Amino acid sequence: ESYNPRTNGTIYKSHENINKVRKLAAAFLDEDLEKAQSFYSANATFYDINMPKGESMTLDQAKESQKFFYENFEILSMDEYGYPDFLDYEHRASKVVLAWWDVRVKRKSDGKIINFINHETYTFNREGKIIRQSSYYNGAALNN
């Protein structure tokens, strides 16, 4: 059976929310957690592919996790891999930025340089704050 094609919103390659994600990345590179947190809603949730299924972190827990990361790694670069898209869905009025990052870090314990690809989805509320972030990367790469 054939279905009629239909749309579900608009995809942007230039948008204010994409700019916010870029500013967020710059804040992480500068290790400015206060500035980074300003892009999030107070009740934001964080998901990570390396966490057990169904688990998430609060904004405060994510901040502590980032501090732990800074204690153990130096971020050398975080470059856009391709370009981010902003998806303004009609269904449920979801607003999502999809971004791929080519990340290069130095592990402080032994000086090893590690490269990995990180895919992030950032869901925004109507006020333009991030309410959900999902991270997809190979966490084992950081420990090898």
Model-found features: residue ranges?
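Short, surface-exposed coil-to-beta transition loops
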Residues: 100, 114-119
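Hydrophobic pocket/interface hotspot
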Residues: 24, 35-37, 44, 62, ...
